[in-house]
């Protein structure tokens, strides 16, 4: 379990987060939504350990491995697909050459990039770049994956396809996932639970359980799906 307790964050004069509490069970997919500037990305970065809270704490399982997928794919243009996927492994000790090759091959296959190992970022579409960013995190076999609006820069059709692929990966690999997005439909499609935050200083004002077992294109036209999307959208407008 990941446990967020009383987390508050100030940036100089800006009060970004206000006493946020959140428990996320192992293997759960939780999405955080809220108005722009409410602190949802700040909360995600605090959970990741990239920044420290002003007050409060985050507890994660001992020796658990996490990975972060940013909004910008942040690929190195002089490295090909295989070498970009290897980047995080170079920062960690203990990986043999054989294990690196095996993990990279598996991760690229999982995200549909097999056959593109020698391609460079400028040769990839926006969707392929995001797949590579995801593969770069998957090579670590993370216990939890934190995703900060990773699909915001791709077109709608690609976005929906990637949502299905992310959900399939999560089901297969059984990692804990925490996503930040502005897209309520995306939040409902991917998640077990959606967390709604208030305007800044952000705090959690509402949570919605999402009951659907099957996640495919047909779900988007399900009246129950639309009802949950509307419920969350209504909370964001209040």
What are these model-derived regions, one by one?
Residues 33-35:
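The feature captures the beta-strand-to-loop junction immediately N-terminal to the Walker
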Residues 48:
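Helix-to-loop junction immediately C-terminal to a conserved catalytic motif
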Residues 82-90, 98-101, 105, 209:
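Short helical segment in ABC ATPase nucleotide-binding domains corresponding to the A-loop/adjacent helical element
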Residues 119-122, 140:
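Conserved signature/switch motifs of ABC ATPase nucleotide-binding domains
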Residues 134:
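Hydrophobic anchor residue at the start of the ABC signature
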Residues 145-148:
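Catalytic Walker B motif of ABC-type/P-loop ATPase nucleotide-binding domains
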């Amino acid at each position: 379990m990941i446990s967020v307790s009383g987390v508050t964050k100030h940036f100089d004069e800006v009060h970004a987060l206000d006493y946020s509490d959140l428990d996320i069970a192992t293997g759960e997919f939780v999405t955080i939504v809220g108005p722009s500037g409410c602190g949802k990305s700040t909360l995600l970065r605090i959970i990741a350990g990239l920044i420290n809270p002003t007050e409060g704490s985050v507890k994660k399982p001992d020796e658990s491995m996490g990975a972060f997928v940013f909004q910008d794919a942040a690929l190195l243009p002089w490295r090909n697909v295989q070498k970009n996927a290897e980047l995080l492994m170079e920062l960690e000790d203990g990986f043999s050459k054989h294990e690196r090759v095996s993990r990279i091959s598996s991760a690229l296959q999982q995200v549909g990039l097999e056959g593109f190992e020698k391609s460079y970022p400028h040769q990839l579409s926006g969707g392929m770049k995001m797949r590579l960013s995801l593969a770069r995190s998957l090579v670590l076999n993370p216990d939890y994956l934190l995703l900060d609006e990773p699909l915001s820069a791709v077109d709608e059709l690609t976005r929906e396809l990637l949502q299905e692929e992310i959900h399939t990966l999560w089901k297969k690999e059984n990692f804990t996932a925490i996503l930040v997005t502005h897209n309520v439909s995306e939040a409902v499609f991917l998640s077990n639970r959606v967390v709604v935050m208030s305007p800044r200083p952000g705090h959690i004002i509402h949570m919605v359980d999402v009951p659907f077992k099957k996640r495919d294109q047909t779900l988007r036209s399900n009246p129950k799906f639309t009802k949950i999307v509307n419920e969350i959208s209504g909370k964001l407008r209040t």
